[in-house]
């Protein structure tokens, strides 16, 4: 969007015309700002979806790795858009589970993990403090090394923060 120059003379018609131009310019800025918000949210959603799609949710001792089941969506209310990762695997993929892949118990490979209380071995009964633990699924004992922290939401934010100037230039051109 180019710099807008509005000229007017000191007479009622010219001032009214200038005021209409200002209102039109204001509407255009609001429209483009909404478009920027939408484009940024879409880019975060797209990038996070790719991260969740390629993540391992369980590193099983038998049967290999299991893929995640996470849906990423955008919720827009008024002038706020929120990117949401929904699914029982989302938190494990974002923050990791178990010391085998993620470092010592009580730490977090995720830059926000400690701040948010998402530390390794800190959830539930603390089985993630072990290299291997099990859970029952369909009556069968399943042994796992846990989940490597893939951080798809965090990484999507970092990626889009690096791209936001280019996105804004494209929207406001």
What are the roles of these predicted feature ranges?
Residues 94:
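His/Glu-rich zincin catalytic helix
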């Amino acid at each position: 969007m180019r710099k807008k120059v509005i000229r007017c003379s000191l007479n009622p018609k010219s001032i009214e015309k200038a005021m209409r131009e200002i209102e039109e310019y204001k509407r255009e800025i609001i429209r483009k700002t909404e478009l920027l918000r939408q484009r940024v949210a879409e880019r975060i959603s797209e990038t996070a979806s790719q991260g969740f799609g390629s993540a391992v949710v369980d590193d099983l001792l038998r049967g290999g790795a299991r893929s995640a089941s996470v849906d990423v969506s955008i919720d827009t209310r008024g002038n706020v858009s929120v990117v949401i990762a929904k699914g029982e695997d989302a938190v494990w993929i974002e923050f990791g589970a178990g010391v085998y892949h993620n470092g010592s118990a009580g730490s977090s490979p995720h830059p926000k993990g400690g701040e948010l209380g998402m530390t390794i071995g800190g959830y539930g009964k603390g089985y993630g403090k072990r290299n291997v633990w099990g859970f029952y699924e369909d009556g069968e004992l399943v042994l796992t090394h846990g989940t490597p922290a893939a951080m798809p939401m965090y990484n999507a934010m970092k990626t889009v923060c690096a791209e936001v100037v280019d996105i804004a230039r494209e929207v406001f051109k």
